[in-house]
Amino acid sequence: MKAEILCVGTELLLGDIVNTNAQYISKELANIGIEVYHHSVIGDNENRLLKELERAFNYCDLVITTGGLGPTKDDLTKESVAKFFQEDLVLHEKSLKQIEKRLLCFNKSMTESNKKQAYFPKNCEILENPNGTAPGFIIEKDNKIAIILPGPPYEMQPMFENKVIPYLEKLTNCTIKSKVLRITGIGESDVADLISDILESQTNPTVAPYAKQGETTLRITAKANSEEKALNLIVPIEKEIRQILGDNIYSSGETSLEEVIASILVKRNLTIATAESCTGGLLAGKLINFPGISSVFLEGAITYSNESKINRLNVKKETLEKYTAVSKEVALEMAEGIAKSSGTNIGISTTGVAGPGGGTYDKPIGLVYIGLYINGKTFVKELNYSGNRQFIRNITVTRALDFLRRNLE
């Protein structure tokens, strides 16, 4: 089965709202083995929407739309889909009562505009929306399936998970399970080379690598006639991949790198403080995303100038003069200085040239040092990257977290 995701809303085209719906739906469809053929974004215009539906169904069996189900005149998705399938819109009394009840929760009364949200194509399956006033629906006709969902993610995602996925799993006539392995420290091409034999010989399960900034994910997907059999198919492939990639795999599922590290720190009761120059607080910000980190994260210092490194972290003036701020020697003194002044088990530091200016022949843009102090032991890592300022800062944070992880495990 091939699918297209069609996100409706002029606000998406104008860039006022980030289109997270397409990303979420693509990921969920991949989990159940449905190929996403195309993504589209279109404004609130009936003629364009009809043309887009016509084009999409020339290539796909399934079109999933989000947005355009609101109460205003420019919310036209439902009307356009009904016209495409040559269906009349009829009032659904149960939905009308649910919308009215929902409005009462906000001390609002039913209006004619809201009543519009209770009209649906005559022959469709209605998807209740306990989180808003816009129910979705599924319509099947002439070997075409359209799944129409509300735009707000907090309404769309529960509806997709609770209603759409069970519906689609029945259509595929088999159980599909996936396991995601998260990898950092090596790039996507290196991962692909290392597991090339697995990638070239894959049938069921399939193994698909995906890259994003600073890490790679591997999705192992198996099909079988039961959940147990599908999961059993994944086990030997996962084991083989883990043997090849080793500690480059930092987690599975949705667990992020900072969550892995924060869990280790909390579990072992290891306190930590950060001293940042080029990353400007991004490293501390990643760590404090984790609930409960306050028990071990004591302090974060942004020491951008040489004076602040000397006064706050006790970096020696002679070290700065001899080696400059961007050096392994200064990175180590920063890490040790923040740990000792904060009274923590661990100190971690970043110093480098993020650009766009400031680079020299000896200290080019993209040169970064990560310093690490753990209970009296010190470690340092040199990085060299090309890219813009934001990329260099973000990749430094990822590499710093990974450097810490590897020295804790």
From Swiss-Prot:
Write down the CDD domains for this protein, in alphabetical order: cinA
What is the superkingdom listed in this entry's lineage?
A: Bacteria
**Pfam families per the record?**
CinA, CinA_KH, MoCF_biosynth
Output the NCBIfam families linked to this UniProt entry: cinA_nterm, molyb_syn, PncC_domain, PRK00549.1
Similarity comment: family membership: Belongs to the CinA family.
Any idea what this protein is called?
Putative competence-damage inducible protein
Question: What species was this sequence derived from?
Answer: Clostridium botulinum (strain Okra / Type B1)
Could you tell me the gene encoding this protein? cinA
